[in-house]
Amino acid sequence: YACLCSSHNRITFHAMNTIVNRSDGKVDLHGLVQAISQSSAEDSLNNLLSAEQWDLLSSYLLPVALPAGQVLFAQGTTDRTLYLLESGSLSVHFEDEKQRLRLAIVGPGSVVGEGAFFSHLPRSATVQAGSPCKLWSLPAMRFTELSNRQPAVAVHLVMAVGAVLAKRLGSRKRRVAST
């Protein structure tokens, strides 16, 4: 997990060899925005936010560095955090008493955690880093703050994530891969 260090009203984020240092508490999302705009995956996020909206959203997102092989979240857990993937790849798999079934590989410019984020239900799958990953997390409580303070940004984000969920549910092989 990324380190959050604070001193003299300056917040420094350390994530995968990158240090973002801004006195306003916002983080630099250039890499994420670029990953979204360059992604050709069917289930990638659409870049529905303006530069100003990305800047407003940046103060609500938390950086996460995930080494290869580490689990981001496990099937059955009740956390509702939404994750936006800037770099790396994530493996989504479902386990029961008989088998472990890989459902999808998610690449940069996409999102995971959308199922629990919207449904308030436990996670339907486990998500694990297939390679070192840089992600941005939006915990449910921070999304509530975003909704109250920047409703237009929250609506645009929900529409983009909802579109990803709809695409995944519309795709036979990814139908069970909404996490």
Question: Regions from the language model: what does each represent?
Answer:
Residues 5-179:
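Cytosolic regulatory regions built on CNB/CRP/Popeye-like sensor folds
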